[in-house]
């Protein structure tokens, strides 16, 4: 039987989809990239925003219309957070939340043996769950390996549905992490990206820390780069930064979710830091990592956000000189405190603020890439995407292109030093230089 996966949302979802693919393959299924050829179609959903829900509904209808006889499985955050709404979707045969996904093949078989009567399997979180270790499975053409090591969130920001969809914080045990990373290294991966719903809370249950995971990965033979996913600012201490700076394999790319550059809005969001604390953290990072990238998420249109609040947020974002900003509109999530507020912002105002913040984001991105001109940096090359260039990324995840020779040889999974000579709004351009001539901390 053939199985097709459609994934929405974050890198954690992508990791989980890879795990589910491995589980179905072990059960005798073949993974297909053609939904019309699938016997089972699985949608791994996201529900961070209403637009994500809308895209999921559209995809569900389209996939059902294209393959009426397939078993349609809806899983992930939307199913867990809104089980009644998910179960009411006529296109969905089997609805399963964010737990027990290792049982999916058995649940599909149970559905088929039960006269294809619609099924729902969404156990509630109790707060005592252990970390679910799904097997890893990556396409052979991938350069970096993404590994989910943490799940759940204890923060309950006023706008966020994720604690309800994912349960409380829990972490992959270190012995399991060692096995996973060693296996990736044996498969030829030189870069590991550690992911989680609230990654900076890794190890909190047993008194450990994210540093434990990063150090373990850096010490694994064959692993040359260790990168982190999104981080909560309040968990990043100076001691942690000092320890990370002492690890040569650590990649200085920090995605620190800001959400707003206005202190009043941050307080209303139930965020646990001020703009002053956030700015101090960024300064501490830059003092330890002279060549680094700090990226962020910024929400516009949170309930009660005034024009003055937004102007403050815009000005703060500009002052931080981010490498990249992901801008998104607030959307009410049923069951969260912010959704109950009477001072919701109109769609037209959200749109205006979105445009203004995106313009700033584009300017900041172009300026960041331009700041790399003159640097010589190690670049891990990836799958060739066009005939004219080799493509790769620096440790701080700056995208780099170098011209390809006429008789193009693949550089994939190799690291070379590149002198950055030009940039545009999307990437940097340069040429390979001998390692002996490389100096990544100074411009020539």
What is the predicted role of each segment?
Residues 305, 321-322:
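Contiguous mid-protein beta-loop-alpha structural module that forms a pocket-lining wall or clamp
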Residues 156, 160-167, 199, 226-234, ...:
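Conserved strand-turn element in the central/C-terminal portion of the radical SAM core barrel
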Residues 209-261, 267, 272-279:
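Acidic, glycine-rich loop-and-beta core segments that form the ion-binding/anion-interacting portion
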Residues 340-444:
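Terminal RNA-binding accessory module
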Residues 42, 77, 104, 194, ...:
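Residue-level signal for inorganic ion chemistry
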Residues 1-201, 215, 239, 244, ...:
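Proteins enriched for Cys/Gly/acidic motifs involved in redox and nucleic-acid/cofactor modification
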